[in-house]
């Protein structure tokens, strides 16, 4: 049940008509990329960073330069699974007063660019907003679904029910430490794609692509026909090409945020984001025909009771992008 605060916030967010991407999900994007013999490029930024309009302009630049799917981060005051780069951006957004209704407005704006928009959020803000209200308002805004990295498989039943009723993708995470039974349960609960967080530790750009990423993708594909997208801190085109050679999707977040943090001003930062997106897109497209094994058509894989956390059965807390 939605809380009064969530209901009030939701009423503000649902004004207007749904964006063009409403309930479209990510399946079509993966299918088109697979037909082209390449992986999908997924880009993340927190809503409201570097500013309310600046984030929308940055998303636009990313899509224009070749990002296929956008992750709109919902800022949260306790981002324990994120590294210092993303935490700095999230702090900036929160200081600017960005809240869930603003994230939904950002999703509406981004969906107009033609790329599916997923909300990346810790579970607490969604629960406080109201699970059904959030699903309804996200669909109305044109959102494709949500990635919920800290939502455990045992506690996600309400979210799965609400998301399914609004035809939203539900993306959960697997990690190298996840045992086979956990990977299977997570995969049966995903719709759209499976997020493979292949590097232990908090988020952040990495200097090299390890073998664990490819092994995790292979293990995950033993349990699902859904596409498998990898987040491990990719920071350049060469790394994107490496990951695209074995995964259905390449997820990049910290590197985009770093470009904005390091820029002398917002306009320069957006240009840097666009340049990075173009470099990453070229890398992804340079691995044509290599990203096989996943069913890039997407869809729902089975009917598990709930989605899962990346860590499955271990005690670490991490999400990599």
Language model region names:
Residues 1-3, 218-226, 235-245, 249-293, ...:
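Alpha/beta catalytic cores of nucleotide-metabolism and tRNA/nucleoside-modifying enzymes
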Residues 1-44, 107-108, 288, 320:
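N-terminal amphipathic alpha-helix/helix-capping segment at the start of soluble metabolic enzymes
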Residues 22-33, 52, 77-86, 95-105, ...:
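Active-site-adjacent beta->alpha loops and helix N-cap segments on the catalytic face
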Residues 43, 62, 73, 138, ...:
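Conserved, mostly hydrophobic/aromatic
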Residues 53-62, 178-188, 230, 234-250:
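Catalytic cores of alpha/beta
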Residues 69, 74, 87-150, 284:
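Active-site beta->alpha loop and helix N-cap motifs at the rims of alpha/beta catalytic domains
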Residues 69-77, 143-147, 152-155, 194-204, ...:
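Glycine-rich phosphate-binding active-site loops on the catalytic face of alpha/beta enzymes
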Residues 83-118, 161-175, 211-228, 272-288:
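Alpha-helix-loop-beta-strand connector modules within alpha/beta enzyme cores
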């Amino acid at each position: 049940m939605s809380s009064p605060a969530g209901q009030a916030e939701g009423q503000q967010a649902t004004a207007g008509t749904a964006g063009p991407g409403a309930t479209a999900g990510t399946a079509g994007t993966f299918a088109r990329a697979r037909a082209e013999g390449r992986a999908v490029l997924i880009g993340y930024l927190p809503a409201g960073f570097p500013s309310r309009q600046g984030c929308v302009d940055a998303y636009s630049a990313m899509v224009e330069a070749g990002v296929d799917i956008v992750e709109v981060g919902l800022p949260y005051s306790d981002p324990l699974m994120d590294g210092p780069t993303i935490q700095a951006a999230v702090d900036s957004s929160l200081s600017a007063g960005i809240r869930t209704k603003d994230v939904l407005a950002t999703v509406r704006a981004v969906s107009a660019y033609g790329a599916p928009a997923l909300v990346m959020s810790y579970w607490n803000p969604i629960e406080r907003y109201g699970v059904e209200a959030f699903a309804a308002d996200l669909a109305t805004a044109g959102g494709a679904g949500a990635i919920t990295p800290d939502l455990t498989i045992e506690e996600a039943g309400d979210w799965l029910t609400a998301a399914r009723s609004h035809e939203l993708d539900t993306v959960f995470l697997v990690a190298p430490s996840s045992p086979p039974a956990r990977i299977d349960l997570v995969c049966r609960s995903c719709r759209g794609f499976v997020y493979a967080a292949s590097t232990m530790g908090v988020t952040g750009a990495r200097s090299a692509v390890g073998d664990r990423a490819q092994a995790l993708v292979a293990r995950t594909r033993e349990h699902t026909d859904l596409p498998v997208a990898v987040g491990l801190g990719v920071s350049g085109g060469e790394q994107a090409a490496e990951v695209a050679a074995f995964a259905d999707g390449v997820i990049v977040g910290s590197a985009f945020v770093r470009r904005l943090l390091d820029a002398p001003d917002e306009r320069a930062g957006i240009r840097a984001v666009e340049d990075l997106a173009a470099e990453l897109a070229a890398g992804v497209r340079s691995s044509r025909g290599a990203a096989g094994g996943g069913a890039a058509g997407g869809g729902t894989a089975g009917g598990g009771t709930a989605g899962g956390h990346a860590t499955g059965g271990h005690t670490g807390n991490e999400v990599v992008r």
